[in-house]
Structures are given as structure tokens and as C-alpha cells.
A protein has these predicted regions:
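Phosphoinositide-binding peripheral membrane targeting modules
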Residues: 32-42, 46-92, 96
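Short secondary-structure transition/capping segments
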Residues: 78-81, 120-124
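Anionic N-terminal interaction surfaces
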Residues: 1-44, 107-109, 114, 121-124
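Canonical phosphoinositide-binding patch of PH/PH-like domains
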Residues: 94-113
Length: 124
């Protein structure tokens, strides 16, 4: 494993490489997390944007969607627990961009918590 891959939080090396191959000048990868459920393949966080792989197309087609932090209006943790319960008990987040909401589900609440906090940092 190369030094860059060791320093970036990621679930799958091939997803990290896919994000790294499309970086802009001066852009760095923060984390790449594998998603579960239908539609989303992974989410990447960089110093400039959120990158989501959308696998909801027919056949073997997929899209890579780049969302600049400046276009994100809000980010939410999706939970079936009350505020009095465990707030980050779920592994899902919702990212609102205009009238569209991207929902991403993870294996583990810590990943959702990290993604939420990184996005919140860049949109605040």
C-alpha cells in the first residue's frame, strides 16, 4: 500500500484510487467510505467537495457526482432513534443540495458521524 493510501481513511483501495484519479490541483482526499444499500457505491470527502458514486442506473452504468461544499445547504444524520436516545446510532446521512437530497448509508455509525462532521466543517 502506498503512503498516501495509508494516510487517508478509506474502506476499499480501489475506491480511494478512483477518487485520487479525479482530484483537482491543490485538492486532497480526507476519507472514502463504502456505502451499503441500493444506489450508492461510495462517498468521498475531499478538501473541496463531496464525491458520490451513484449506481442506480440500468445495466452496469454508474455516475460520479461532485458536490462542491458551497452548494450543500444542509447535512443530516438519519436516525430512527429520538434525540434522547443515541443520536448517531444509525449509519446514514442525508446531504441537501438545492431541492435534491442524497442519502448515503454506511456500515457503522462512526462513519456517518465522521462524514457529517467533515461536511458541517466545510459548509459552516
Amino acid at each position: 500500500m502506498d503512503l498516501m493510501a495509508q494516510q487517508v481513511i478509506h474502506d476499499r483501495r480501489e475506491q480511494l484510487r478512483q477518487i485520487q484519479s479525479g482530484l483537482l490541483d491543490g485538492e486532497d482526499v480526507i476519507a472514502v467510505y463504502d456505502a451499503v444499500g441500493t444506489g450508492t457505491g461510495f462517498i468521498g470527502l475531499t478538501t473541496r467537495r463531496v464525491i458520490i458514486q451513484d449506481k442506480s442506473f440500468m445495466g452496469k452504468k454508474f455516475a460520479i457526482t461532485s458536490i462542491p461544499y458551497s452548494k450543500i445547504t444542509s447535512v443530516s444524520v438519519v436516525s430512527n432513534k429520538s434525540w434522547g436516545g443515541e443520536f448517531f446510532s444509525t449509519g446514514a446521512i442525508a446531504i441537501n443540495v438545492g431541492t435534491h437530497t442524497y442519502e448515503v448509508e454506511f456500515r457503522g455509525a462512526q462513519k456517518a458521524h465522521h462524514v457529517h462532521n467533515v461536511i458541517l466543517h466545510y459548509i459552516s
